[in-house]
């Protein structure tokens, strides 16, 4: 995240930008190497193309968590290009629902939230750039298929939502589209059906190659059908991590409500405690958008954990220096998944699985587990939720800061620091070549904070994201300058190092990240050529 305030600018940051010629799309890395090898640095993506395109499908009106998720999304939408907000059906909102309200689509709820966004937009512009206009957002709201599942697709059944998806894919824009499926996927299925009906197989493959789909919970039978019919599609299916922003809920071994690591203190460890946190940081005194951010409560029943399952799927797009939509196994705020697709990872919903069995085999990227130590408690956590939980403290701080931006002047709010890697202040993920046994020296000393806050540095090895099974020692891991010691047995593997820069601020400690991907040469390589 690179946030440049519109009325206050850090002078050191300006000087750094000037001296670096606004390094975007490349970097010059000066590494101290103890052998004759000089490692070279290459950004994975140029900064101009690092902004992702995004279309969100959601069953608005099913329950209040959809409105929570989308209000939260709107205070982050300057970080990606939002090209569609499509109201769709799913398992819980469909014509067959018992409750009349849940039998029809509710795109008007998108408009309600955009109206709130419009009122706080002038203040948001004081804190960061690239906010879309409210009228533009209204123009990309539409309805998808009105019926449930793959049965409501086929010739002559196109919808405004399916046509919007095709129009986005037809744009002269080489960037892929991150499609968030926060309910059923039949509107996306209809778009693909319509395109296949009038195009060659090669053209269909080219269109499918532009899609990156994150399916939240497999909430209808269309996802498996799409993956079976279009086997080259890049499709992430999350049955667990998608719920890890505030959950997963349920009960632990002591029969208590279990919500993962508690970063909403001093409020109670419960869903109600989370909502007390939301009342403090979102719903009260944070402008028109916060005022319409609802509680996740069903009628007069129990309050459930905040934001349900639809926040994690889009949240990774906020950190371009950490998250790569083409690399599901690398991890980030949207979780971590298998590098290769796996066969028949079924929906978590028992009533959907029988339909999926009829179209099997199909292949998707499924979630994988991490091991992480909670820095607040020292508790070691392992499991499928951990690839999201490990970022939770930073994600919650980001939410606090951004809802503050809705009402506060620049000098009363906090803003994200800018992490620099060897002088490069872009948003790019970086790649290095190295040899086994190398010592690589990194420097984050050019990192800045727009508020002049003290910066705290952390360099760490994200073991699960790479292919080297051992540990990588980082000397000076809590300093601006650090040395990474590439193990002698790491030949032919990939190592992921994370630079995490956070500010010291009483409002909330915000973070910026840079991922450094080190490709280690094989020991038997006849000649090692650095990346040019």
Residue ranges and their predicted role:
Residues 47-441, 447-454, 458-468, 483:
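N-terminal acidic, glycine/proline-rich low-complexity segments
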Residues 519-527:
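Extracellular interdomain linker/stem segments of modular secreted and single-pass surface proteins
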Residues 1-26:
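N-terminal secretory signal peptides that target proteins for export/translocation
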Residues 509-516:
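Extracellular and select intracellular beta-sandwich modules with Ser/Thr-enriched
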Residues 502-509:
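Short, solvent-exposed loop/turn segments at the edges of extracellular beta-sandwich modules
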């Amino acid at each position: 995240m690179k946030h440049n305030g519109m009325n206050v600018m850090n002078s050191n940051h300006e000087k750094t930008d000037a001296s670096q010629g606004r390094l975007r799309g490349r970097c010059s890395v000066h590494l101290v190497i103890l052998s004759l090898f000089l490692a070279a640095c290459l950004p994975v993506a140029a900064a101009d193309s690092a902004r992702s395109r995004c279309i969100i499908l959601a069953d608005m009106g099913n329950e209040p968590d959809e409105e929570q998720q989308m209000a939260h999304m709107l205070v982050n939408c300057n970080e990606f290009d939002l090209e569609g907000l499509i109201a769709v059906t799913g398992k819980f909102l469909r014509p067959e629902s018992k409750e009349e309200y849940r039998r029809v689509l509710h795109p008007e709820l998108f408009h309600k939230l955009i109206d709130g966004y419009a009122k706080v937009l002038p203040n948001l512009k004081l804190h960061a750039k690239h906010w879309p206009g409210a009228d533009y957002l209204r123009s990309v709201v539409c309805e998808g298929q009105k019926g449930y599942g793959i049965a409501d697709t086929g010739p002559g059944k196109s919808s405004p939502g399916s046509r919007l998806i095709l129009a986005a894919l037809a744009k002269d824009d080489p960037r892929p589209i991150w499609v968030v499926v926060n309910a059923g996927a039949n509107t996306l299925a209809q778009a693909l059906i319509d395109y296949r009906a009038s195009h060659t197989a090669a053209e269909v493959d080219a269109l499918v190659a532009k899609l990156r789909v994150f399916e939240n919970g497999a909430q209808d039978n269309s996802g498996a059908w799409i993956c079976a019919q279009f086997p080259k599609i890049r499709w992430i299916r999350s049955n667990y991590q998608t719920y890890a922003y505030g959950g997963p809920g349920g009960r632990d071994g002591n029969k208590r409500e279990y919500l993962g690591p508690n970063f909403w203190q001093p409020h109670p460890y419960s869903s109600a405690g989370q909502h007390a946190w939301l009342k403090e940081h979102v719903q009260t005194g944070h402008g028109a958008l916060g005022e319409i951010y609802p509680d996740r409560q069903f009628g007069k029943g129990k309050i459930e954990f905040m934001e349900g399952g639809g926040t994690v799927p889009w949240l990774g797009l906020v950190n371009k220096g950490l998250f790569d939509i083409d690399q599901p196994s690398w991890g980030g705020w949207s979780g971590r998944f298998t590098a290769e697709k796996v066969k028949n990872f079924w929906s978590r919903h028992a009533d959907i699985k029988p339909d999926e069995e009829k179209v099997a085999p199909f292949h998707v990227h499924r979630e994988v587990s991490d091991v992480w130590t909670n820095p607040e408690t020292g508790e070691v956590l392992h499991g499928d939720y951990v690839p999201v939980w490990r970022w939770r403290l930073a994600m919650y701080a980001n939410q606090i800061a951004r809802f503050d931006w809705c009402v506060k002047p620049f000098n009363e709010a906090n803003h994200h620091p800018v992490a620099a890697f060897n002088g490069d202040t872009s948003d790019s993920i970086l790649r290095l070549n190295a040899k086994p046994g190398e010592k690589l020296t990194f420097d984050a000393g050019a990192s800045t904070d727009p508020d002049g806050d003290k910066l705290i540095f952390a360099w760490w090895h994200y073991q699960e994201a790479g292919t080297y099974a051992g540990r990588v020692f980082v000397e000076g891991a809590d300093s601006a300058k650090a040395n990474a010691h590439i193990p002698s047995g790491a030949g032919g593997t990939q190592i992921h190092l994370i630079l995490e820069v956070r500010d010291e601020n009483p409002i909330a400690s915000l973070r910026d990240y840079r991922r450094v991907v080190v490709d280690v040469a094989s020991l038997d390589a006849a000649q090692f050529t650095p990346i040019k």
